[in-house]
Amino acid sequence: MERVLGFATRFLEEVRGDIERARMEGSDTPPRLRCIHERAGHATPEFRTLNIPVPSGLGGLSPDVLSGIISRYAEQKRPDCLLLALEAETDDGMVLIAESRCKYGTRMFWMQPYTVTDRHVAWGEPVSGGWRDPGAEEMILDAGFAGRLAAATR
């Protein structure tokens, strides 16, 4: 779990920096997926970061659509860990949502509000203190590992 938390924390720092740069330019950031493959005999894992395109005029993708896209990708690439970051708008304003999921069952969720004033991002305190276990709550990344948990723990 500590290794996944380290991956997730570094990914989140990168995404926050990208959001800040995008706001300075007056643009948006698409949902981002990072796939991690750990190879036997290699000191470092392989990281692939993908932007998930959002069709113009849609404003965003539903969790079901995102889950389906990620599930199909994960079925082909079989990652050891997936990290997802996306922005969402709530009644209280903008939030950064992040999820982390590995093939051994580690699941973590993050939500952090932020405001944009004159193209400057001010980050609020993370909801629930930061990374947390989502419990029985379904996450977007769960579909990417459907059926793989039992095989990974044998």
Residue ranges and their predicted role:
Residues 65-154:
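Low-complexity intrinsically disordered segments
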Residues 1-64:
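N-terminal domain-onset segments
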